[in-house]
Amino acid sequence: AIFFEKEMIEVLRTVDTEGKVIGQFCCNNGRELLSLVKSGNASKGVGFDIAENQVAFANEKAKELNLPCIFEAVNVYDIDDRFREQFDIVIITIGALCWFENLNRFFEIVAKCMKPGAVIVLNEQHPCTNMLATEGDAEFDPEHKMECHFSYFEHEWTGNGGMYYMTLKNYHSKTFTDFTHSLSEIISGMCNNGIVITGLKEFDHDISGGFSSIDHRGYPLSMILQGNKQ
């Protein structure tokens, strides 16, 4: 199975993965990277995630499926020079950027791990959703779901809820801090670290699980950003 959104699959088909080394930051349980390495006939996949249980599961799956993938339990900021200029392709998917307050620092690490000329494909929630309230927010109005309640530029919040990656079921978690980012923050973080933007696609359908009730109503809900390291 290919565990990507339809539009992401279409973009990845334009990227030559055969014999290449693919890296994924905030890979969760590894299913996306495993499926891409297998379907794209890549030579190797490397995934990073801070959650040790998810990484253990991913490594077990890689062994079970006999795929050339390794997964490391590490804070992205602590990724060492073993991975300097190792990746031909980098993928970043939904739910990664919100864990990082400083995207310039995040993309500095990402760029360090990319070979010159390497490709990056980022599939994330659209930054315009930063302004919307979701069910559970005090501001949420089921009659006016597209009403903007928050600043596009500043929105940091803490929570105790999460969503299972495989089942989309909600659960109670330890308190965490979540950071939202404007499109300019994301693009600048890449450009400041030698990544040239080569494509941007925007979509009016949700990939986060929080805004599907306003799918296809003209509001930007998700995006794919592509780049190359100089």
Question: Where do the language-model regions lie?
Answer:
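Class I SAM-dependent methyltransferase SAM/SAH-binding core
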Residues: 21-79
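A short acidic, Gly/Pro-enriched loop at the edge of an enzyme's catalytic core
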Residues: 81-90
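C-terminal lobe and adjacent flexible extensions of AdoMet/dcAdoMet transferase-like proteins
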Residues: 185-230
